[in-house]
Amino acid sequence: MSAIVDIIGREVLDSRGNPTVECDVLLESGVMGRAAVPSGASTGSREAIELRDGDKSRYLGKGVLKAVEHINTEISEAIMGLDASEQAFLDRTLIELDGTENKGRLGANAMLAVSMAVAKAAAEEAGLPLYRYFGGSGAMQMPVPMMNIVNGGAHANNSLDIQEFMIMPVSQTSFREALRCGAEVFHALKKILSDKGMSTAVGDEGGFAPNFSSNEECLNTVVQAIEKAGYKAGEDVLLALDCAASEFYHEAEGVYSLEGEGLKLTSTQFADYLANLCDKFPIVSIEDGMAEGDWEGWKTLTDKLGKRVQLVGDDLFVTNTKILKEGIEKGIGNSILIKINQIGTLTETFAAIEMAKRAGYTAVISHRSGETEDSTIADIAVGTNAGQIKTGSLSRSDRISKYNQLLRIEEDLGDIATYPGKSTFYNLR
């Protein structure tokens, strides 16, 4: 039995210089698992609650000492002596101990740090790489990366309303080659921006954050970068967007306000706006194309684009099986973004991935804008054969740590590693 003998929570910093929670779990054998949790900027209103101290005299109120104290006291008491290999039982113990619907008492950040650290310790004890511990012998599919090379919206201080402009390398036969392609496009884009006298400073997720006059100008420039790097847009590399539409939706008026372009659009008009972009550019995926509360708008968008574009629910579904189930029943979207800290335990994360797959929805494993060097999501992507990962641009170590872990996993898998390319969009025609 892999009995838990010690648990230590601590406050560390994320990639934005804000406090986050890290946890060490020690087993009887002397093996240790360590995990740190991420934090988001644009968050869904129904996400599990991240516990912050609220003490303005310390880290501007963003300290996490309360969450850390919960780990070091009542969580520690509740799981001490439990078998680390019993992940589902352990996560259920945490959920019952918290006793709230949204994990607001103990904090999803405290619970997730423990959940992840336990899994890492158990994998180490079993002598297995983490992805293999998660997925067994069937884990062999590398994910297609969604690489966020231009940041706008809440992730950057510029005039772009759409939050992320991403590239997806799809013609390659390995993750290693896909990563190279992404990096070469990233550097080509930097040169184009530099030649135009535009900013090459990067946003929270490592993408560039220049001031473009419109979303179309940005997309044209990304296509230019793909071609400058020697690839074909639409063949070798596809485009993806994260609108984060909740951020510019005015519920009282029922309009989407694209301030950068001086547009105020109804749900139907915004769906037409996005469809027009998809007609002009090789866009294969749109995340949060409507606001989380605008389910009618989501239905309109799904009916219009759902057969040819991956429509990913992030703020919409918040990695929650109850909300996802409702979305599946109503025919809303066709894909879910998986963010481990939106739900707060690994068991619930895996349940959301499984539910999506059974319904013919794709699952995209994702980072948050406030990240750490922890690379667990890379192992989750391969362990669940998710087929897609979204973990930022080709700069900043907090993003690169996930890509480097995927390189190691692909090397470990050897000849049995597969790279799905375009077939990762198995529900599109």
Swiss-Prot record:
The keyword Cytoplasm applies. GO terms for molecular function: magnesium ion binding; phosphopyruvate hydratase activity. Its cofactor is Mg(2+). Mg(2+) binds at residues 242, 287, 314. Signal peptide: none annotated. Its EC number is 4.2.1.11. This is Enolase 1. It comes from Cupriavidus metallidurans (strain ATCC 43123 / DSM 2839 / NBRC 102507 / CH34). The gene is eno1.
